[in-house]
């Protein structure tokens, strides 16, 4: 996954940011900026939700500071097979659905995570859009 650097003041609601601490991509839910003080600079308070895990974070930075923004690669593909896996987590074992997706341009097969809200729509033969966020994630399913 490629990242570019932008200033915090250039970000808008709906943009994506890359958090280096946990290596996840977050979607910005809200941004509030404060006025600069007599000797200070304007600050931005960013609330964001992880695209893969749903974790919520709050970042407070000066608007002139740099922040990493991911260049999201979108892949059109077709589901070949799905598989349920048990993954350890802090709440115990969690069941995760992974889909084998064939890229319709290169015919390469990749494994992509399937979010909770799309688990019932995913079936072999369905066309999908996969976002490469460091970890491939199915973001949209098209029924035939």
UniProtKB/Swiss-Prot annotation:
Taxonomy, superkingdom: Archaea
Modified sites of kind Hypusine: 38
Gene Ontology CC terms, in alphabetical order: cytoplasm
Pfam families: IF5A-like_N
Keywords assigned: Cytoplasm, Hypusine, Initiation factor, Protein biosynthesis
GO biological process entries: positive regulation of translational elongation; positive regulation of translational termination
Location, primary (coarse class): cytoplasm
NCBIfam families membership: eIF_5A, PRK03999.1
Summary of the function given for this chain in its UniProt record: Functions by promoting the formation of the first peptide bond.
UniProt protein name: Translation initiation factor 5A
Organism in which the protein naturally occurs: Nanoarchaeum equitans (strain Kin4-M)
């Amino acid at each position: 996954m490629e990242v570019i650097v932008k200033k915090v003041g250039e970000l808008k609601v709906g943009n994506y940011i890359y958090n280096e601490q946990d290596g996840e991509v977050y979607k910005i839910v809200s941004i509030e900026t404060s006025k600069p003080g007599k000797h200070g600079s304007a600050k931005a308070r960013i609330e964001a939700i992880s695209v893969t895990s749903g974790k919520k974070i709050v970042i407070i930075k000066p608007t002139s500071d740099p922040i990493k923004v991911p260049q999201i690669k979108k892949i059109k593909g077709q589901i070949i097979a799905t598989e349920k896996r048990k993954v350890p987590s802090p709440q115990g074992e969690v069941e995760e659905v992974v889909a084998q997706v064939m890229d319709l341009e290169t015919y390469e097969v990749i494994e992509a995570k399937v979010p909770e809200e799309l688990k019932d729509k995913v079936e072999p033969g369905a066309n999908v859009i996969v976002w490469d966020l460091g970890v491939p994630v199915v973001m949209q399913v098209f029924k035939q």
